[in-house]
Amino acid sequence: MEFNQKHLKFFFAFLSGVLAYIFFLLRYLSSPPTRLINENIVGLWLVEIFIFFLLTKNEAFKKIKTIRFNYKFLLCLLPIFLIALFLRFYNLANIPPGVHGDEGEWGLIELGVLNGKYREFFSLAQKGIYFDFSILSFATQAIFLKLFGVNILGVRASSAFAGTLSLIPFYFLAKEWLSKRGALLATLCLAVSHWTIAYSRLGISNIWTVFWELWSFLFIFKGLKENSRPYFSLAGVFMGLGLYFHHTFKVIPIILIIFFISLLAKEGKQFFKIILPLTCFLLMVLIIFLPQLIYYWQTPGSFSARIDEVSVLNRVEEYQSKYQTNSVSKILMTQFLKTVGVFFRGKDIGFFFYGYQGPLIDIVSLVLALIGLLIIFVRLMENKSSFLLIWLLSVIIFGGALTIDAPSSQRLIGLAPALFLMSGLGMEKILSFLKTEKLKNFLLLITMISIFLINYQVYFKQYIHSDAGWAQKEPATAIAEYLLSLGESYKVYMLREENPILYFHHGTIRFLAPKIQGVDVSENTRNYILAKDTHKNLVYILPPNSKFLSLLHQVYPLGQEHHFTNPYNGKAWFVGYEIRQDNYNIEN
């Protein structure tokens, strides 16, 4: 083979990439886990990723130039995109009305990134089972905190952004598999789904799973269609980055492994035609995620800590008692059926985040998805059909049946695009029975309007005016707002002895009222009250009907008592008992 200029460029690009990556790894490995890894290391990591991608640059640009756009359908897509933007950003600071504790913790970690507290970008925010996500993911989301301000809007904006932009890869993926009308219907379903809206308006990272998986799947199927290294390389980039974000993304490699094994079994020797592009994909995933893998290797157990915590297999005795059976297979089948049932009858146990108790999918989208599922079984030998079925079953099993507290909508969110692709497939089949274009367009329009109205009603009319969400059940947001109204001159005593839900160091309170000083009182509450702190204005936060309220009246007779009720159900929430410092002398 003649060694021409093209090969020479490839050789130097490859050599540069290898040398850059070796240099990066040497720098990274020379720093012990306890040492801060500064921005120079991250910059070097980004540079070498770019150099590796240059290997397929020319071919990638050629691919982009060949893309043909149907402007008529892009104009139809624009209103859907604008609707999605509105549904995710409208009054984002106040809807949902309560600030979830995890949103508060997310905001505090993002603020820590901005303030330089967290600089080990390839380590975890917190060791253990809570917030054990890569600092790199928090750093990405912290950009929005910088842009929108250190407030709940800044925390939630990253999710709204990811949820909205997910429509772009989804539409082009749908176009690969469906007709133009089917793709539009599927895109609208994803855009207006109350389920995806809910997680696009929460300041946590679950919705980023949808964002990264859709870009990964889009370029994998573009790569399969054209046997293209650039597309597979791009898929590897998005796949590697996705692994830095939420735990729910960890099911994506499982989906792809099962799919490629099925592809090998189905195509035999023909499969080996994609070995080189597939190698590019795996190489890019490894290049991008290797720094985090090294961290996991240096800190054994950190990779699977959360998985071990939520695995139902680690709580077999508990679930044997719960389901009244000694059979593990019956437990898993019950879990599986409950997870499937959340799309039909609701009962989301994951009320800690969303908590809407109706079906996660509106009735119109659900009926269309069931039609689509039947079509998938008929066309199971097609790649897109087998992939959708693997996607569907993998998330239901690994995000539902095998986890505690199933079904939990936050763990199933990565399944939403698959379900709506099935809806588009069902719509496509129904439209095929109509003869005229006018009838097809009319039915499509009526269906899309119906789906929009149902989902809008569920989220913006029913859900946010109920106590279905955990942040709308717990009083942390109301407590934080109450303390802010009192000001920094007050010291807070949070009496936890009778109600462990009330605690001062709750993420919501610390994020919304960071300058307020306070302590949690979990025991010897009577002694704390009798000690008569006279250094500042005081406020005691205690549960309604607390036995200590009468004692406060005895010790501080001039104190003011304020009762707070949950505005969504009218139930008593908490009591604030205020004592001003200038009343101490009068009392004494």
Model-found features: residue ranges?
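Transmembrane-lumen/periplasm boundary regions of multi-pass, lipid-linked membrane glycan transferases
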Residues: 95, 105-120, 125-127, 133, ...
